[in-house]
UniProtKB/Swiss-Prot annotation, chain A:
The lineage of its organism: Eukaryota, Viridiplantae, Streptophyta, Embryophyta, Tracheophyta. InterPro entries: NA-bd_OB-fold, RNA_pol_Rpb7-like_N_sf, Rpb7-like, Rpb7-like_N, S1_domain. This is DNA-directed RNA polymerase II subunit RPB7. It is found in: Nucleus. Keywords: DNA-directed RNA polymerase, Nucleus, Transcription. GO terms for cellular component: P-body; RNA polymerase II, core complex.
Amino acid sequence: MFFHIVLERNMQLHPRYFGRNLRDNLVSKLMKDVEGTCSGRHGFVVAVTGIENIGKGLIRDGTGFVTFPVKYQCVVFRPFKGEILEAVVTMVNKMGFFAEAGPVQIFVSNHLIPDDMEFQSGDMPNYTTSDGSVKIQKDSEVRLKIIGTRVDATEIFCIGTIKDDFLGVINDPATV
Amino acid sequence: MKQMSVVADSPVHSSSSDDFVAFLDNELGASSPDSSPDKEAESQDELESVRIKRRKIESIDETEGSTSEGIIKQNLEASVEVDVCTHPGSFGSMCIRCGQKLDGESGVTFGYIHKGLRLHEEEISRLRNTDMKSLLGHKKLYFVLDLDHTLLNSTLLAHLSSEESYLLNQTDSLADVSKGSLFKLEHMHMMTKLRPFVRSFLKEASKMFEMYIYTMGDRPYALEMAKLLDPQGEYFNAKVISRDDGTQKHQKGLDVVLGQESAVLILDDTEHAWMKHKDNLILMERYHFFASSCRQFGFNCKSLAELRNDEDETDGALAKILRVLKQVHCTFFNKHQDDLVDRDVRQVLSSVRSKVLGGCVIIFSRIFHGALPSLRKMAEQLGATCLTEVDPSVTHVVATDAGTEKSWWAVKENKFLVHPRWIEAANYFWEKQPEENFIIKKKQ
Ligand SMILES: [Mg+2]
Ligand SMILES: [Zn+2]
């Protein structure tokens, strides 16, 4: 799920960045520092969307660095237990399949794939219904439900299921 | 100012939705007790602390009503569902079946399939059973392949001998590796030569087997070699096992292979790596293309590269082994008396092997004591009968010296007199070798 939230961060800036571009320098450093990072608390910071407020800078003894408290708006992505996500299948094997929703790694084990779908090995391994109408293979887009999440300092792991109504393939690359 | 600045990367009042922030906070408190905000501190002199203290979640009900989204309700259902789950395995330390967070690190790691994946014994055997049925339905077995000296030979660039330096100008393009066989891997400071016939070998073998790579090399090396051998990822996708994935040091084991042992063949030049699975092993004659590789095994001869030579493309070691594989595969699937799942490829392998020297009656003459037992065992596995006393039924005298009493006897009685390498070659090539190539000369 995406959230638009306000976060705060103390930014340290070298004196060479002071001057009339100070604000721009602060913002670009902020974007460089936080976008694409993952925090256990908020998930992935997808994009900085705006600056709420830049507080008064504090000059530090000795170094001349100045610390600015910056409040910024950003879009974060964090999956939750129970959430329905759309993801792209990255690997299919006899244990189940792995999928990605942005930077999130999701595993759907064959325990959580409908019983009427069977694993087919070969150079394009897949799970297929007995009548052949539905097929999950690499690059398929699937809708799945998250049943477990683990957010580490740098990575997010999820356990997903497609064993429920309205879950499963939403776009089969083989048919387009 | 001596005070350290304190950063707080924490939700403050958002213009968009306070509900979300509260929800987020609840959810975080509930689901990731291990992710301390300290981990987020990434800059050396920045200390982060979170202003909003994590609320303690007594029960899941507290989250109810904190947002208008349907997610909470689903969340509630998912959490309340009490399932008696055996936790067959884990991904990111969560059960792959119920999603519950699991403590400890039990089970076997399958990092070669995906980072963070572990499976328990029962789950492994369940997967092996179901997979076995479908695989046999496709008339396939499992095949585990070693890399070094079996499918290819690698050397550090620094270890190329002066007579081999001409190779530096003969390497093939990395842009389309499927066409080449000699590659310089600059970033790994290495040169790799693929064994002649390897591409046809893999293509043919893939029709009969589900294939794994299993190397004592490390993971980056293994993946790099897999890319050279299988640029399209048709054969070894997520089936590249390196020493980083094994469960025992200096040993290879089938415990990390998701195939039943009765259906696995192994091709490796190092017998002692497979102590527990010798019956599955097809021992490969070592491929020494580079001088460094010869030296490593104590050979003082010139390398193939130094001789500007190579194994034969159509009749080299891999081509010969492919014929054996076809024979074993054919025998496994074509005998109709019992159920497929009850068959054992190890028995088929040993029966094919036992025909190689079938009908040969061997007597050894003055073979070094240390070498004798293994040589005798090898000959017997190849189907030969080994005697200790001369006898009219003897067909071959195996000796290293033509001047022994038994050697004289062989010449007099018109029996074959061969060097022990005759047995070893038959063992490598699964074929009785022409005796005239293994004649022993009289010692001066
Ligand atoms: Mg080897
Ligand atoms: Zn479980």
